[in-house]
Amino acid sequence: MNVFGIGLPELIVILVVALLIFGPKKLPEIGRSLGKTKRAFEEASREFQDEIKRQTAALEEEQQAKAEAESPREISP
């Protein structure tokens, strides 16, 4: 298990220190808060990536349409 470069022994030490600092009653609340924050960050990141993809596709379509409009066409007699 290696989350953010933190192994299991380091994670245990962090949890013990958090337990000592915040106490057993406050720890679940902090965990829920961190979980909600993580989900919100992931959702914002996903929305950002989707918007970048949409903008890139729109720009490519615009460039393709411009190239087609500027390309010379054969005129048949």
UniProtKB/Swiss-Prot annotation:
Coiled coil: none annotated. Gene3D superfamilies: 1.20.5.3310. Residues 63-77 have a biased composition (Basic and acidic residues). The keyword Cell membrane applies. It holds the Pfam family TatA_B_E. The chain crosses the membrane at residues 3-23. GO terms for biological process: protein transport by the Tat complex. GO terms for cellular component: TAT protein transport complex. It comes from the Bacteria. Signal peptide: none annotated. It is found in: Cell inner membrane. Residues 56-77 are annotated as: Disordered. Keywords: Cell inner membrane, Cell membrane, Membrane, Protein transport, Translocation, Transmembrane, Transmembrane helix, Transport. It is a single-pass membrane protein. GO terms for molecular function: protein transmembrane transporter activity. Belongs to the TatA/E family. Part of the twin-arginine translocation (Tat) system that transports large folded proteins containing a characteristic twin-arginine motif in their signal peptide across membranes. TatA could form the protein-conducting channel of the Tat system. NCBIfam families: PRK14857.1, PRK14861.1, tatAE. Forms a complex with TatC. This is Sec-independent protein translocase protein TatA. It comes from Thermosynechococcus vestitus (strain NIES-2133 / IAM M-273 / BP-1).
